[in-house]
């Protein structure tokens, strides 16, 4: 029995996205990205540290950025349909990100699929620190159950922490 967790190649772009969420950006940042193609990250949004999570100020900032990218994707769709280059920098960036997949229909659909993902790097690090006291117990338990030791990293972030 292989102890390695399978990683199908078709999931690699999604794995890479989540690695970035849990290692590069904190809960004071987030990615605006395509909800289906996680390789498409439009921008990183910096959130005001003085505002609570879910505050109206934060929500408005995220909504404004989401609208900005949805508008850029619609502009890129129209330009692509007309065989022209878009004039806006964001629309040009959207075309660059989508590459050969940048058809008018794809870009219009993407305009409706701009999603925000809050960073988790600070929570993840804190979870690793918290789990340190249980490390040897978890390792022994996983070994006795024949589970891959890499699974021990999964519970380091409890929801809502």
Regions found by a protein language model. Give the residues of each.
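Secretory-pathway/luminal and periplasmic proteins that interact with or process carbohydrate-rich
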Residues: 159-161
């Amino acid at each position: 029995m292989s102890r390695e967790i399978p990683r199908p190649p078709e999931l690699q772009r999604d794995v890479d996205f989540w690695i970035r969420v849990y290692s590069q950006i904190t809960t004071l940042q987030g990615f605006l990205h395509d909800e289906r193609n996680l390789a498409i990250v439009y921008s990183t949004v910096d959130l005001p540290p003085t505002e609570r999570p879910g505050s109206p100020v934060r929500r408005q900032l995220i909504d404004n950025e989401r609208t900005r990218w949805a508008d850029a994707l619609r502009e890129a769709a129209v330009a692509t349909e007309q065989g022209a280059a878009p004039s806006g920098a964001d629309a040009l960036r959207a075309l660059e990100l989508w590459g050969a997949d940048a058809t008018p229909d794809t870009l219009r659909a993407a305009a409706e699929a701009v999603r925000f993902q809050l960073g988790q790097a600070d929570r993840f690090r804190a979870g690793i620190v918290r789990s340190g006291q249980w490390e040897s117990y978890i390792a022994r338990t996983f070994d006795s159950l024949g589970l891959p030791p890499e699974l021990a990293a999964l519970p380091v972030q409890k929801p809502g922490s």
